[in-house]
A protein has these predicted regions:
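A short, small-residue-rich loop immediately preceding and capping a beta-strand
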Residues: 109-131, 143-146
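Catalytic or ion-coupling anion/metal-binding cores of large enzyme and transporter domains
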Residues: 1-51, 58-79, 84-85, 90-95, ...
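Glycine-rich, N-terminal phosphate-binding loop and its surrounding beta-alpha-beta segment
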Residues: 66, 105-109
């Protein structure tokens, strides 16, 4: 069989071999089935968290769609590190590393088994960019399908997310709640399957997938346990076969306009700073030029129009009921912020998707154009002698634009968390956590334990936090991450001492360590760096290959050529 371009399917290199067919036969794959488009169905099911717990069920529905459309589905799984469960532990250092491992493992399966197309089912934070990176690297017809957001928990009339539990720990330490209330929040926060419910990293990236065009429009917003998930999963499988037959390649969709639309989607919803890292990485794999200044340029002109947690009031399921991303797209098109002609993997343009939006009467999640929640987007990129290569500050959910104070330095996250719990963080402090970068960790941990404890202790309006690590999408407050160069690579963050004055000014986009250059040079000459004790095995391999956070913390040096569009050596069926 061939695609519409007349070229033989890639899979015939495998399925044309008698030996391969013999080994497929016990699995139920006949000659007739093997002659169809072979579509890999990748997922990350595991029992290590609720985010991906529905993946096997979704994979079954996707496979039904593939078979109904005349294709043959091949299900396989890969890993997932659950961010929320490993948060605050050494295990969290594996999270960002897993993005690369997932990408690599999908590439290995697709290239080795010569799949003609791919559906990548994603859920927890790093699985989403990993799926997109794999498709961009392979340039193989396919799509990304998000398994969906968890429903909110409820306690005393309030919607809960997992961040509610993290912040309740800080509130307990501050004497604001008792242990019984913490336990009640803990037991109510996560009512079922699905990824974390606010506009944290998973939902931020799930939105970005639709604006990049890699996910069918409207599919990702459907909550994890919604009955429509069956329908959208089957449709995704059918679409994958069509993409193979029409030879629609990811890089034809992943244009510069698509990346700009994705940036707008994340800054206009107050999304996770992790999107900066991930979009840089996806663009790298797709061969699309993208840099930190693009995020600044777009965020500066993009107001926040979605009132979503952690900076706002609502969760992802509320956005779905309000009218979904199609409604947000209508707002963004009307405001002239996005490229309406950018095309989705389902064949429609963003303008066509937005035109079909149905706004729920009385909804308050997506605000009117003349009532933005903030005049500029939810992040800013700032530079200075503390971050010559740049760093990211989250602006959603607060109005602070500057901070000056003495440094309080910690060599790792655990020491800082204990200091917060012990009440050793004071008003005006600039909390500095270093040795948590891509190399220094290794793995660039998220700091939700610390940031949530600061919020829970009532300090978020009075301190700043600066780190060469990352923040969870659930973080809010005056927090600065991705400081580059990191401490382990000789960055100035490694030279800061307790009491050093630090000034942060969003208006001028500057972060300044107010110490004479001669003193900094003396400290630099005396500083000795020691590798992290975690830097062995896969962690050590990552530390040896990872690039700066300012470049997306990628481990490949350049975009790949992509898989061959024709079978390299189509074998005769009689072999």
């Amino acid at each position: 069989m061939s695609n519409n371009g007349g070229a033989p399917l890639r899979s015939t290199t495998i399925t044309g071999l008698a030996t391969a067919r013999a080994m497929f036969r016990p699995l139920g794959f006949t000659r007739e089935r093997l002659a169809r488009p072979n579509v890999g169905v990748a997922h990350m099911w595991s029992e290590t968290g609720p985010c991906n717990f529905s993946h096997r069920k979704l994979a079954g529905w996707v496979k039904e769609g593939i078979e109904a459309a005349g294709g043959t589905a091949f299900e396989f799984s890969t890993i997932s590190i659950n961010d929320g469960i490993t948060m605050g532990t050494q295990g969290m250092k594996g999270s960002l590393i897993s993005r690369e491992v997932i990408t690599d493992s999908i590439e290995l399966m697709a290239r080795s088994h010569m799949f003609d197309g791919l559906v990548v089912i994603v859920g927890c934070d790093k699985t989403i960019p990993a799926g997109a990176m794999a498709l961009a690297r392979l340039n193989l017809p396919g799509l990304v399908l998000y398994s969906g957001s968890i429903a909110p928990g409820h306690f005393r009339g309030e919607d809960l997310t997992i961040v509610s539990v993290f912040e309740a720990i800080g509130a307990l330490d501050a004497g604001k709640i008792d242990a019984a209330e913490l336990q009640a929040i803990e037991e109510a926060a996560c009512p079922g399957a699905g990824a974390c419910g606010g506009q944290f990293t998973a939902n931020t990236m799930a939105c970005a997938m639709e604006y990049l065009g890699l996910s069918p429009a409207g599919a990702n917003a459907v909550p994890a346990v919604d009955e429509r998930k069956t329908e959208v999963s089957r449709q995704a499988g059918e679409l994958a076969v069509r993409l193979v037959r029409d030879n629609v390649l990811p890089r034809s969709i992943l244009t510069r306009d698509a990346f700009e639309n994705a940036i707008v989607s994340f800054v206009s919803t107050g999304g996770s700073t992790n999107a900066v890292l991930h979009l840089l990485a996806i663009a790298h794999e797709a061969g699309v030029p993208l840099e930190l200044e693009d995020f600044h340029r777009i965020a500066t002109r993009s107001p926040i129009y979605a009132d979503l947690k952690p900076g706002g009031r609502y969760v992802a399921t509320d956005l779905y009921r309000a009218g979904g991303l199609a409604l947000l797209s209508r707002r963004l098109i009307d405001a002239g912020l996005v490229h309406p002609d950018a095309r989705n993997v389902d064949g429609r343009t963003l303008a066509e998707i937005a035109a079909a939006a149905q706004e729920t009467p009385g909804q308050r999640v997506v605000v009117p154009l003349d009532q933005p929640l903030k005049q500029t987007g939810g992040i800013e990129i700032i530079y200075g002698n503390l971050a010559p290569e740049g760093c990211v500050i989250k602006l959603a959910g607060h109005d602070r634009t500057s901070h000056a104070g003495p440094a309080k330095v910690f060599e790792n996250e655990e020491d800082c968390f204990q200091a917060v719990r012990d009440g050793r963080i004071e008003r005006d402090d600039v909390v500095v956590i270093r040795n948590e970068g891509p190399v220094g960790g290794p793995g660039m941990r998220e700091m939700l334990h610390v940031t949530a404890a600061i919020v829970g202790a009532g300090l978020s309006e009075h301190v700043a936090l600066v780190t060469d690590g990352r923040f969870s999408g659930g973080t809010h407050g005056f927090m600065i991450a991705h400081v580059a160069p990191e401490a382990a690579k000789g960055g100035a963050i490694g030279l800061v001492r307790d009491g050093d004055p630090i000034t942060i000014d969003v208006a001028t986009r500057r972060i300044t360590l107010d110490v004479p250059e001669a003193e900094l040079e003396a400290r630099r000459a005396a500083r000795a760096t020691t590798p992290s004790p975690m830097a062995w095995g896969v962690f050590g391999k990552y530390a040896d290959t990872v690039r700066s956070a300012s470049l997306g913390a990628v481990t490949t040096s350049a975009a790949s050529p992509g898989v061959a569009r024709t079978a390299a050596a189509a074998a005769e069926p009689s072999r």
